From Swiss-Prot:
GO biological process: GPI anchor biosynthetic process
Residues of the signal peptide: none
Protein family membership: Belongs to the glycosyltransferase 22 family. PIGB subfamily.
Name under which the protein is recorded: GPI mannosyltransferase 3
Known pathway: Glycolipid biosynthesis; glycosylphosphatidylinositol-anchor biosynthesis
GO molecular function, one term: glutathione binding
Domain of life according to the entry: Eukaryota
Length: 771
């Protein structure tokens, strides 16, 4: 059959069939798809035992992932989600740090409301189980991680389901997509964090799975077809209720994603544009109608929720765009090169999958010109590739860039990476030929690299912030027993009674979590801020310096001017040991105070330690805790360990004793290693086994006492190879009589041999003693 006949038959068959939202998934080119049973009606949303097992396994996997993450990534993980959620769940006076974005109504309250419900449920569980306050604190720390792990597992699951729809239920590409998601270092590092971008990513991939991809598959209505003809087709067979329900779910989720992150609209504008230009008029009408209905419903619900949260009517997405674009406040937090997303964003997201993603993007974009003749698989790949190009391109026009801004594209990139990955590694996996050994070794190497990156970034790098807050929480439980009674579960930070410990953070702003990890409202703490110049002129913005920059520009001046009492009047005792506790200011929610009280615990990075040792040498502060943070850091202010100084002499002495004990243990372990090496060396020598290096010196230890012992160099040094006697020196022949070795020590051989024998015997005794 010629290509023209195939095209004609395809067009006629597609136009005669009734429109549907989802055509059957295409056949995989590696494994054919088995047809569904004729007596069973399969639904795209139906779940099978396999799908259920995959979902539960992914959720369990992400739970392990969530509780493995011990490192700090971005402040928004806490200050844009958990801190406002803490205030919603427990009240305004519970010590949550509400940043400037919330005071200026730039964020939607939908995301914090999710975790507020999680906090409330965890608190109820703690009360029902009558947990101790320490156990309750651990539960409140773990609850958001558990919720986010479930969200991340759903994102992985729907990534796999969309790949099954594109490539076929039994295709290798679908399983390769799942494998890419599971072994992705970025997914392990970021997916279980409470960032709004993580929730946005999950919502986006679920909505993409529900999107009517078949709309762009069928040819559009010809020009001679009128709108009346389209209405007649719509009257013959209306869309199925199940397909319409899927469309509404898709558009509702897309609207929620756009409310959370307004930049998510770039994804849906691209997909809607393709569907609009490639579908019929009746479907265009349906699309417009459902977009208006679902969009208005979600928007109205969001406005009501924000009205209850903020206390006034507001529209956060519009204010977000106004502050970040019109006032250019995002630039205050850094500028990036125009090629950031290409040179850094995609490599960070994909890591070892980057080459396969580039090949997949190229293949998909090369098929754009064949929209009308291709398969549904090609069309879906092309549209996914388009949004993976359009979104970074538009976001590159903004000066401030972060890799998490394009995080919602990662599932689509994994789907596009699957075919090149299968093409390259599948023969090496299913075949036993030795010619594929390099590919097998490459696969093992890539997996090991992913594992190393994932574990290093989630356990080792930047692990100090969570450790230091756990230490402060433990110190509060130890030194503030009066604040740990059941009647004081929710005291106010503005109420100095009961009184807990105090802490001050001399760090760059938002370097640690806050109330979500401190938990106890009676822990009074303050930290340096970096709020942007809101509602200021261009000249004022040019000279504006935030509090953290003021401190690092001149630490001595800052401490003299911004600390109560300056550098001369510093407390000698911690507040929990004083007869009259120092007054506490509610600086946990705002650090714009003119001065800060000297705290019981002073927290800072090790980079600042020499400066503070010089400034506070006359004070009672001394080290009482130190935890590892990073081996390297791009910010010079955050280099080194995190150090805690305290005023309590008992804590200082306990830390010195513990440090001394650790040093002694390290020395003992080192000494044990030395003794073990001596023991192995001695046992090897008794067995007649010498190291190659010691064989060179074996002649000196095997010399028997003799009256004719020669002390010339060759008798005490024996090379592994033969030694040639020199017969000429500088071209002059050496006489024969000078080549002999006279025993010039023969006169003292008996005495010298006896001395050597005694020395050798002594060495043997010492060796037996060590062994």
């Amino acid at each position: 059959m010629s290509s023209s006949r195939r095209r004609k038959s395809f067009t006629s068959s597609s136009s005669s069939s009734s429109p549907s939202f989802h055509s059957p998934p295409p056949t995989s080119r590696l494994r054919p798809r088995s047809p569904p049973s004729s007596n069973t009606k399969t639904s795209p949303t139906s779940t099978t035992p396999l799908a259920t097992n995959i979902l539960l396994s992914l959720i369990a996997f992400r739970l392990v992932n969530a509780f493995t993450v011990r490192t700090f990534f971005q402040p928004d993980e806490f200050f844009q989600s958990l801190e406002p959620a803490w205030q919603i769940a427990f009240g305004e006076n519970q010590g949550a740090w509400i940043t400037w974005e919330w005071r200026h109504q730039l964020r939607s309250s939908i995301h914090p409301l999710l975790f507020a419900a999680v906090y409330s449920a965890a608190d109820v569980v703690a009360q029902l189980l009558r947990l101790s306050l320490a156990s309750r604190a651990d539960l409140l720390v773990a609850a958001p991680k558990t919720a986010q792990a479930v969200i991340a597992g759903l994102g992985d699951f729907y990534t796999w389901k969309l790949a099954r729809y594109v490539y076929g239920a039994r295709s290798y590409e679908a399983w390769a997509t799942l494998a890419l998601t599971v072994v992705s270092p970025w997914q392990w590092f970021c997916s279980t964090r409470t960032l709004s971008n993580c929730l946005e990513t999950t919502i986006t991939i679920v909505a993409l799975y529900l999107w009517p991809w078949s709309w762009s598959f069928e040819t559009p209505v010809r020009k001679k077809a009128t709108r009346a003809a389209s209405r007649e087709r719509a009257q013959r067979g209306p869309e199925g209720s199940d397909s319409l329900q899927r469309l509404r779910q898709c558009l509702s989720l897309a609207a929620v994603a756009c409310i959370l992150r307004p930049t998510n609209i770039l994804i849906w504008m691209g997909l809607a544009s393709v569907a609009w230009f490639r579908t019929s008029w009746d479907r265009r009408a349906i699309l417009v109608r459902e977009v208006l209905l679902c969009g208005c419903a979600v928007l109205g619900l969001s406005c009501v929720v924000d009205r209850l949260f903020y206390g006034s009517w507001t529209f956060p997405p519009l204010r977000f765009l106004y502050f970040n674009i019109a006032q250019s406040l995002a630039v205050f937090y850094g500028r990036n090169d125009w090629h950031y997303y290409v040179s850094q964003g995609f490599p960070l997201l994909l890591t070892t999958a980057l080459p396969f993603a580039l090949v997949g993007l190229y293949r998909a974009l090369a098929q754009v010109r064949t929209f009308g003749l291709g398969h549904l698989q090609s069309l879906v790949q092309a549209q996914l590739a388009l949004i993976c190009v359009i979104m970074p391109f538009v976001l590159s026009l903004v000066s401030h860039k972060e890799v998490r801004f394009i995080y919602p594209l990662l599932p689509s990139l994994h789907i596009l990476s699957a075919p090149p990955l299968v093409d390259y590694f599948l023969p090496a996996v299913i075949r036993s030929s030795r010619s594929y050994t390099p590919r097998r070794l490459t696969l093992i190497f890539l997996l090991l690299v992913n594992i190393v990156i994932a574990l290093y970034t989630t356990i080792y790098h930047a692990s100090g912030p969570s450790n230091i807050l756990s230490y402060l929480r433990q110190q509060h439980e130890l030194h503030a027993p009066a604040a740990q009674t059941p009647s004081n579960l929710r005291p106010s930070v503005k109420d100095p009674s009961p009184h807990g410990i105090t802490a001050g953070f001399l760090m760059p702003c938002h370097s640690t979590p806050w109330r979500s990890h401190l938990i106890y409202p009676t822990i009074h703490a303050w930290a340096l801020t970096c709020e942007p110049p809101v509602d200021q002129t261009a000249a004022q913005k040019a000279t504006y310096i935030d509090e953290a920059d003021q401190f690092y520009a001149n630490p001595a001046r800052f401490l003299r001017e911004h600390m109560a009492g300056g550098l001369r009047h510093i407390s000698r005792k911690p507040s929990y040991l004083s007869a009259q506790p120092r007054p506490q200011h509610p600086s946990t929610t705002s650090t714009n105070d003119a001065s800060h009280e000297w705290p019981d615990y002073l927290i800072f990075f090790a980079q600042l330690e020499p400066t503070l040792q010089s400034l506070l040498r006359a004070s009672s502060y001394a080290e009482c805790y130190r935890t590892f943070n990073t081996a390297w850091h791009d910010d010079w202010r955050r280099k080194g360990d995190i150090v805690a100084w305290c005023l309590d002499p008992a804590e200082q002495q306990a830390w010195r004793s513990a440090t001394r004990q650790r040093d002694l243990e390290n020395r003992e372990r080192q000494f044990d290693r030395i003794i073990e090496s001596f023991r192995k060396e001695a046992s090897g020598k008794r067995d007649g086994k010498l190291s190659p290096f010691r064989r060179w010196f074996s002649s000196s230890s095997s010399v028997a006492p003799s009256s004719s012992l020669s002390l010339s160099w060759p008798t005490s040094w024996r090379w592994p190879w033969g030694q040639r006697k020199r017969t000429a020196w500088l071209g002059v022949q050496i006489p024969q009589w000078t080549r002999t070795r006279p025993s010039w020590t023969a006169w003292g051989g008996d005495w010298f041999g006896g001395w050597r024998q005694k020395k050798k015997t002594k060495k043997l005794l010492e060796r037996d003693l060590w062994s």
